[in-house]
C-alpha cells in the first residue's frame, strides 16, 4: 500500500489583498488599512506548534517588506518560506516584463526579511493560464525550483485546464527549462472537476 502525502500550504496575505474586492486593489491605499497579519499569524503559528505540523507559507513580498518580523517568526518556527508574488496581481493581466519585475521584487523583499530566498512560488489566484506559458521560464530564471500555481480546472481567475490530472509533474518550459509543478488536486463529480480544498471554503 502506497502512503499518501498531505501538504499544508498557507498564502500569507492581508484581508485587503483579496482579488475580487475592487475597492482595495490599489497598492497606494494598503498602508492605510488596519492589518490583521501580525495578530492572526501569531495565532496560526501557535496552533501549528501545538499540532506539531509544519507548513509552506507562500508570502507576499509586500507583507515581507512591511512586516518583516512576521516572516522571521515563520522561519524561526521551522516552516518553509515561499513566494506568493509581490503585489498580488493576476499573472494573465501582466506582461512578461512586469511579471519578472514583480517576482524579483518579491524574492528580494522576502530574502531581506528573513535571510531566505524562496525556491517555491504560487501565483495569486492560481492565475498562470494557457495564455501565459512564459511565466514558467520567468520563474525558472528567478531560481524557482517548484511551483504551485496550476489549477487544473475552470475557475473565475482562469485555470490551466490542459494540464491534465491534478498530480505533481515536471513542466518543461518554452526555453527548455524545468519547473516541478505541484497542482491543486480535484475530484471528478458528475462529470465536473471539483477542487475540494483551499481557503475559499473557510469564507462561506
Outline where the language-model segments fall.
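Active-site beta->alpha N-cap acidic-glycine motif
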Residues: 2-77, 122
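Short, well-ordered coil/turn segments that N-cap beta-strands
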Residues: 2-6, 51-55, 76-81, 114-119, ...
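A cross-domain feature marking catalytic cores of carbohydrate-active enzymes
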Residues: 10-12, 57-61, 83-87, 122-125, ...
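Short, hinge-like loop/turn segments at secondary-structure boundaries
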Residues: 26, 74-76, 99-102, 137-140, ...
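Acidic-and-aromatic substrate-binding clefts and catalytic sites of carbohydrate-active enzymes
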Residues: 33-38, 56-68, 89-100, 124-131, ...
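CE4/NodB-like, metal-dependent polysaccharide N-deacetylase domain
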Residues: 40-50, 54, 96-132, 138-146
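Structural motif corresponding to the early beta-alpha repeats
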Residues: 79, 83-96, 119
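Active-site-adjacent pocket scaffolds in enzyme catalytic domains
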Residues: 116-117, 123-204
Amino acid at each position: 500500500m502506497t502512503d499518501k502525502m498531505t501538504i499544508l500550504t498557507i498564502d500569507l496575505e492581508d484581508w485587503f489583498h483579496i482579488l475580487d474586492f475592487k475597492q482595495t486593489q490599489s497598492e497606494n491605499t494598503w498602508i492605510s488599512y488596519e492589518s490583521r497579519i501580525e495578530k492572526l499569524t501569531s495565532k496560526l503559528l501557535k496552533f501549528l506548534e501545538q499540532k506539531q505540523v509544519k507548513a509552506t507559507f507562500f508570502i507576499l513580498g509586500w507583507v515581507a517588506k512591511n512586516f518583516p518580523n512576521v516572516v522571521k517568526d515563520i522561519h524561526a518556527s521551522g516552516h518553509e518560506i515561499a513566494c506568493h508574488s509581490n503585489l498580488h496581481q493576476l499573472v494573465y493581466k501582466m506582461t512578461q516584463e512586469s511579471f519578472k519585475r514583480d517576482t524579483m521584487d518579491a524574492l528580494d523583499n522576502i530574502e531581506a526579511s528573513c535571510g531566505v530566498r524562496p525556491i517555491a512560488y504560487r501565483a495569486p489566484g492560481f492565475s498562470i493560464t494557457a495564455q501565459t506559458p512564459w511565466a514558467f521560464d520567468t520563474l525558472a530564471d528567478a531560481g524557482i525550483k517548484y511551483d504551485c500555481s496550476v489549477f487544473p480546472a475552470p475557475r473565475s481567475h482562469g485555470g490551466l485546464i490542459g494540464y491534465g490530472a491534478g498530480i505533481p509533474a515536471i513542466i518543461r518550459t518554452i526555453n527548455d527549462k524545468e519547473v516541478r509543478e505541484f497542482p491543486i488536486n480535484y475530484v471528478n463529480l458528475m462529470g465536473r472537476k471539483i477542487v475540494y480544498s483551499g481557503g475559499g471554503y473557510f469564507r462561506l
